[in-house]
A protein has these predicted regions:
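N-terminal glycine-rich flavin-associated loop
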Residues: 82-99
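Short glycine-aspartate micro-motif
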Residues: 53, 80-83, 152-154, 173
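Alpha-helical interface subdomain recognition
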Residues: 1-78, 103-132, 221-366
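Alpha-helix C-terminal capping segments
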Residues: 17-20, 75, 90, 94, ...
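FAD-binding core of flavoproteins
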Residues: 100-240, 244
Length: 366
């Protein structure tokens, strides 16, 4: 997409989600009722959101990371529930390599979906019929399902991504660990600070690919990029909510937004968000170009977007006052989302250390 096309695409995603009651869907998702949220995912698939990171040869759009960033920013802006970075970015990147290079010699490549045992996880409900893999192979069928919006996937990538997010909504759960990719078996579930987000332990099952460290590293970077875009979008939403509230909440006979201290605080939030955007775009461009600096660029973007979103969350809570603490206020959905995504896909310390290593020429693990 060109610049104007991206703007139009972002506007289309924004309009779709603005016309839906996403906060209500997120609350029901947190209560275990996934139906409204999954309906939103299907509608977004109709716009091509789920096909962005899937190569054209597998039925996707083969879009650039910049296009993916545009979509994920809007999804974060509206606090869409579900494994956004996992299903829209990381899993397609990982499966694309598996589909091109072939699955590990486990017999999986020559079998239908029913033969893999995935029917027990609910994958049969996605419309990918048993034995339908044909010449495309299992990896290709999964990619086709992702592109069409028939399949939602998630993954764990220890140690940076120790848990699989929203595995209950996913019909495919992967584990990338120690250079191999597995079809994961789920373990214990853990609570997240975000009620609309669940975290599940993932254990290695059947091997899908060996010697996949390079593919996993790219998937990890693409996931971190998508998470950064979500954070930037969530930060924007929090700033907008703060400005609206500051214009109507009165103290001492004046809107609190008229006080210089509040103006400066919100201006600092706006500056932080705007300064993070060029780093996010640069990281997306570097990933799209397979630049040597892509890894550190992604880490720099993650740090900047997470810091900016966290600052927006703190300011929003302060501007809203005591009402900001209440779960009934929709603001809480974005506050929780930011708190959950800031440490996801690598902590701030890990990403800062990565930038320092690469700038100092020390290299080290990606």
């Amino acid at each position: 997409m060109g610049g104007s096309e991206r703007d139009q695409f972002a506007a289309a995603v924004h309009d779709l989600l603005s016309g839906a009651d996403v906060p209500a869907a997120a609350r029901r998702w947190a209560d275990g009722d996934l139906a409204p949220g999954l309906a939103l995912w299907r509608r977004l698939a109709g716009l091509g959101v789920s096909a962005l990171a899937v190569p054209e040869k597998w039925g996707g759009l083969g879009a650039s990371p910049l296009d993916l960033v545009v979509a994920c920013e809007e999804l974060g802006h509206h606090a869409l529930p579900g494994p956004v970075a996992e299903s829209l970015a990381a899993v397609p990147a990982l499966l694309a390599v598996l589909a091109d290079t072939g699955l590990a010699d486990t017999g999986l490549a020559d079998t239908g979906l029913a033969d893999t045992g995935l029917a027990d996880t609910g994958l049969a409900d996605t419309g990918l019929a048993p034995g339908a893999c044909g010449e495309r192979g299992l990896g290709g069928e999964w990619l086709a399902g992702l592109a069409a919006g028939d399949l939602i996937a998630t993954l764990a990538m220890p140690p940076r991504l120790p848990f699989a997010a929203d595995a209950g909504a996913a019909r495919l759960v992967l584990l990338a660990e120690d250079g191999a990719v597995y079809r994961a078996r789920l373990g214990a579930m853990h609570r997240s600070v975000d009620p609309a987000r669940s975290l599940s332990e993932a254990r290695g099952g059947e091997v899908l690919a060996r010697d996949a460290a390079e593919a996993a590293a790219r998937a990890l970077d693409l996931g971190a990029l998508a998470c950064s875009a979500q954070l930037l979008g969530a930060g924007r939403a929090l700033l907008e909510a703060s400005v609206r509230h500051a214009s109507v909440r009165a103290q001492f006979g004046r809107p609190v937004g008229a006080f210089q201290a509040v103006k400066h605080k919100l201006a600092d939030v706006a500056i932080g968000l705007e300064f993070a955007r060029p780093l996010l775009d640069a990281a997306a461009t570097a990933l799209g170009d397979d630049a040597a600096t892509a890894g550190r660029d992604v880490s720099a973007a993650k740090v900047a977007c997470a810091d900016a979103a966290y600052r927006a969350a703190r300011a929003a809570l302060q501007v809203h006052g005591a009402i900001g603490y209440t779960a009934e206020l929709d603001l809480s959905l974005w506050l929780a989302k930011v708190r959950a995504l800031v440490p996801a896909w690598g902590s701030q310390a890990e990403h800062r250390a990565r930038v320092m290593r690469e700038l100092s020429g020390q290299g080290g693990p990606r």
